[in-house]
Curated annotation (Swiss-Prot):
Keyword line: Cell inner membrane, Cell membrane, Membrane
Keyword Transferase annotated: no
GO cellular component: plasma membrane
Species name: Acinetobacter baumannii (strain SDF)
Pfam families, alphabetized: YidD
Name of the protein in question: Putative membrane protein insertion efficiency factor
Main localization category: membrane
Localization of this protein: Cell inner membrane
């Protein structure tokens, strides 16, 4: 599904966007934002984030740098020397990073 959506966005970027000229008020552009949102969050949340972004992109809307948000913050638990459990909020971009951090913390 993500692959098909990405294909349509690339088609827009190559065939339609050059005819319209630069109109996006944000960096990255709305179409680039959509590609990044799909890659980072998958089809459902990526479409939701992209739709919200496109709705904000109008003459009376905001402008400037507006990156795709990171994935949700996950909590991991680990034990310190005093045997009390402490929770740490760590943003994970992928499972490998989470696994490496979990192995490091014990």
């Amino acid at each position: 599904m993500v692959r098909i959506l990405r294909w349509f966005i690339r088609l827009y970027q190559i065939a339609i966007s050059p005819l319209l000229g630069p109109r996006c008020r944000y960096i990255p552009t709305c179409s680039q934002y959509a590609l990044e949102a799909l890659q980072t969050h998958g089809a459902i949340k990526g479409v939701w984030l992209s739709s919200k972004r496109i709705c904000r992109c109008h003459p009376w809307g905001g402008s400037g740098y507006d990156p795709v948000p990171l994935k949700a913050i996950r909590f991991i638990s680990f034990h310190q020397i005093d045997s009390q459990t402490h929770h740490v909020a760590v943003p994970f971009r992928d499972r490998l990073m989470k696994q490496n951090l979990s192995n490091h913390l014990g």
